[in-house]
């Protein structure tokens, strides 16, 4: 297998260059499906059938306003339309490592089943499962605020590496710094916390089911979780965000890159550039819980990787993204976060949205302390919340 490995991406051809802005972007033409036990109506949407395409290899992933054409000649990017083609290359390159984004063959009715509902602290907490694909049900906690019935903003809350999985952000653990699904629900958001494969109550072997990585299975499950949120009567589908710490910090970025329904993202201790990750040793990214091709194909070498987090941040533009990167994070070197922010900023500025990309560098370790959580929640308030409604409650 070579760095020119052919991948699956969504259909697009450009008359002058090879990929259009439609490549690898989910398009939604809703199909209404029944939601069992909730009384809600759920929508499932099928992306266009994938076609195989190739993405060129960009050696310098910090120079983002450059596009490689079919002859691998550099072309300057001066417009949003031209950037969309580079963005398509980024999503294609991610799939070289993660495996292809699933298509209609894995989409099925969500068939939401509520296991229990608990009311406490002015909230309703529903334990439920939903069908991510045929034969696979994902456990989750849905937290619903009290107050007048209306459509509210919603946040997908992704957990860190912890045995409790979804239970920790939902408030069932003993670490108050990781209970962001609970705290955001108290703030007036509908929140959904789901288990990543082989955490909490969720057991699933992605490799036995045709996935090239647990990362891509997580992305697919999280896209389906957004399907669920957007279909709820309690949710405004135009105001959806994602948040996570550590494992959840990079998973929130991954799903947001592939699902543009997510309008605002917070990543706490979630990433740095690959060369800065443990001085370029990518072993931590290469086990079966992440992306084995990093070891098997790219030999743990950042210089051989088809993508980097510089590109992921830029691929979110112009949507709102807050990165929280403590100065003493032992997992993700703060210098590598600064490099990613600096590289992505020109893309945000291309959209006239430089203020939509923000980083916080608190004095601390690999944690999500109160001041940074408040910063994160205020970020969502800025981009998603209905202030008038919140003040009236």
Write out the residue ranges for each language-model feature:
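N-terminal pre-domain segments of enzymes
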Residues: 35, 39-96, 100, 389-393
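N-terminal cap/lid segment of alpha/beta-hydrolase-fold proteins
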Residues: 102-149
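Cap/lid segment of the alpha/beta-hydrolase catalytic domain
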Residues: 150-151, 155-231, 258, 278-279, ...
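Primarily recognizes the serine-hydrolase "nucleophile elbow" in alpha/beta-hydrolase
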Residues: 224-286
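Mobile cap/lid helix-loop segments that gate and shape the active-site cleft of serine hydrolases
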Residues: 269-312, 331-341, 349-353
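Short, proline-enriched alpha-helix->beta-strand connector loops that line the catalytic pocket
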Residues: 315-321, 354-356
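Conserved strand-to-loop "acid loop" that flanks and positions the catalytic carboxylate
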Residues: 317, 323-332, 363
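C-terminal catalytic histidine-bearing segment of alpha/beta-hydrolase fold enzymes
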Residues: 342-343, 347-393
């Amino acid at each position: 297998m070579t760095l020119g490995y052919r991948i699956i991406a969504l259909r697009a051809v450009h008359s002058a260059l090879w990929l259009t802005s439609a490549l690898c972007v989910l398009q939604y033409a809703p199909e209404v499906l029944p939601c069992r036990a909730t009384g809600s109506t759920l929508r499932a949407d099928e992306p266009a059938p994938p076609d195989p395409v190739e993405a060129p290899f960009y050696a310098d992933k910090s120079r983002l306003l450059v596009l490689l054409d079919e002859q691998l000649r550099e072309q300057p990017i001066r417009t949003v339309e031209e950037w969309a083609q580079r963005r398509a290359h980024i999503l294609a390159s991610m799939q070289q490592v993660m495996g292809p984004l699933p298509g209609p063959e894995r989409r099925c009715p969500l068939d939401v089943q509520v296991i229990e509902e608990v009311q406490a602290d002015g909230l309703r907490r529903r334990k439920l499962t939903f069908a991510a694909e045929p034969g696979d049900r994902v456990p989750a906690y849905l937290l619903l605020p009290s107050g007048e019935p209306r459509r509210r903003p919603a946040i997908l809350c992704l957990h860190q590496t912890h045995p409790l999985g979804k239970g920790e952000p939902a408030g069932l653990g003993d670490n108050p710094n990781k209970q962001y699904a609970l705290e955001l629900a108290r703030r007036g958001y509908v929140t959904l916390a789901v288990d990543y494969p082989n955490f909490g109550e969720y057991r699933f072997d992605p490799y036995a089911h045709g996935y090239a990585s647990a990362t891509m299975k997580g992305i697919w499950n999280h896209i389906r979780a957004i399907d669920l949120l957007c279909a709820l009567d309690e949710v405004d589908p135009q105001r959806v965000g994602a948040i996570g710490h550590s494992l959840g910090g990079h998973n929130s970025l991954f799903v947001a890159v592939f699902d543009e329904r997510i309008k605002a993202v917070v990543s706490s201790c979630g990433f740095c550039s690959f060369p800065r990750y443990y001085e370029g040793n990518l072993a931590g990214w290469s086990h079966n819980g992440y992306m084995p091709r990093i070891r098997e194909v790219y030999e743990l070498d950042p210089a051989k990787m088809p993508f980097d987090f510089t590109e992921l941040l830029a691929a979110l533009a112009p949507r709102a993204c807050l990165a929280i990167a403590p100065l003493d994070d032992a997992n993700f070197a703060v210098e590598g976060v600064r490099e990613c922010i600096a590289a992505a900023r020109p893309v945000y500025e291309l959209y006239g949205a430089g203020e939509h990309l923000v980083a916080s560098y608190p004095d601390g370790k690999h944690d999500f302390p109160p001041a940074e959580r408040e910063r994160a929640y205020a970020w969502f308030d800025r981009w998603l919340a209905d202030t008038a409604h919140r003040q009236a409650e």
